Amino acid sequence: MKSLQIICLLFIFVARGSCRSCEICHNVGNDCGYDYVEECHSPEDQCGKVFLEISSAPLSIRSIHRNCFSSSLCKLEHFDVNTGQETYLRGRIHCCDEEKCEGRPFPGLPLSHPNGYVCPGVLGLFSEDSSESEAACKGDETKCINIVGYRKERFPGDIAYNIKGCVSSCPELRLSNRTHEERRNDLIKVECRDAVKITPSE
């Protein structure tokens, strides 16, 4: 069941998309098994390629997405969220002006140790409210991120998600404009704050 949730979660972050045509594909793994070209709709005005990875020791699953993206999403470029319990959600975004964008592969996870900061940690799917645990921040992770939203699909319907964890910096994410496109990824909460420093007990 956990593996199924991880695979589903990989697909909900990529919203569909100015008169531009881009290559479209969604696949688990590092390569697209199929693709087709589709005209984009405003505000998704750039072609892009996204690698997503959820690693939850010892399981690691990657997916690839080529699609139409908004310029605001393209500016994000990459993200790494430590949701606790040795689980990471990672993404690499590359946009271009051509139908088929080629991005750089994932770097390996850095070897880092807890730095004394903590954040609430959640990697939840199918619900905006999920039980949270404490995420021990590592390396240069000193910020806490909280993202809640849903992916609207014709089938199986709206997929809610809730993500909390440690990040090294606050991403430039904005709440979605719900006035466009029938199939979309809607952010309904984006919060980022300083992590809490744990004082060692004497």
UniProtKB/Swiss-Prot annotation:
SMART domains for the chain: LU
Compartments, as annotated in UniProt: Secreted
Signal sequence range: 1-19
Disulphide-bridged cysteine pairs: C22-C47, C25-C32, C40-C68, C74-C95, C96-C101, C119-C144, C137-C166, C170-C192
SUPFAM superfamilies in the cross-refs: Snake toxin-like
Record keyword tRNA processing present: no
Gene Ontology MF annotations: phospholipase A2 inhibitor activity
Main location: secreted
Distribution of this protein across tissues and organs: Expressed by the liver.
Statement: the UniProt record of this protein carries the keyword Signal: yes
Keywords for the protein's UniProt record, in alphabetical order: Disulfide bond, Phospholipase A2 inhibitor, Secreted, Signal
GO cellular component, one term: extracellular region
Pfam families: PLA2_inh, UPAR_LY6
Family label: Belongs to the CNF-like-inhibitor family.
Subunit structure and binding partners: Heteromer composed of subunit A and subunit B.
Anything else known: Concentration of this protein in the serum is 8-fold lower than in the E.quadrivirgata (another non-venomous snake) serum. This difference may reflect the difference in the food habits of these snakes. E.quadrivirgata preys upon snakes including the venomous snakes, whereas E.climacophora only preys upon small mammals and birds.
Protein function: Inhibits the enzymatic activity of the phospholipase A2 (PLA2).
Name of the protein described by the UniProt record: Phospholipase A2 inhibitor gamma subunit A
Originating species: Elaphe climacophora
Species lineage: Eukaryota, Metazoa, Chordata, Craniata, Vertebrata
